[in-house]
Amino acid sequence: MTDWTSLAYAVVDVEGNGQQPPDLVELAVVPIVGGKIGEPRSWLVRPERSIKYYATRVHGLTNDDVASQPPFAAIADEVRTALAVPALVAHNAHVDTGALQREFGDWQCPEVFDTLKLARRLLPRRESYQLGVLVKDFNLAADLPDNLTPHRAAYDVRVTARLFVHLATATDAQVLSLEALRGERAGDSDEATTLF
């Protein structure tokens, strides 16, 4: 069994403009290396299309907030560097990875650990797996700066990183292996299905 901390992760969260498909207006990335949560990076992004009112109601960002920010193309190399790890972590990850794939185009997404799916598998029979509920139930926002608010990328990426570490270390009072996080059973491997 492989220790989950042997892999480097980038936790990512994105916020969109509410268009279909959405343009990014904010994203944040925080590394997890050796099981330790690192320093987050965040970017505001000027989208090609305006931010819809209902999106502003969710994350609080307005068109004025991003009017003087760079377009994604101007920060793409920085973001690509921050995401250059063996694995990504996100809550409801298909939203984040889908938005990044649309922005990058040629991006090869690494292995993804979805904390929504992990929580459903590792914490069965909960009433809710919404990020906000899990944050409250496990006190994952403790000691965060007061200027951070839910549904902003800088907040969500931090609490998602804490949730991932919590899930990897607190299930039944044992640290999970990388294989267990992946949902692999003991003895599962590519070699087991090889005939020759």
Residue ranges and their predicted role:
Residues 152-163:
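Acidic, divalent-metal-coordinating active-site segment for phosphoryl/phosphodiester hydrolysis
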Residues 55, 119, 177-181:
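Generic structural signal of hydrophobic/aromatic residues within well-ordered alpha-helices
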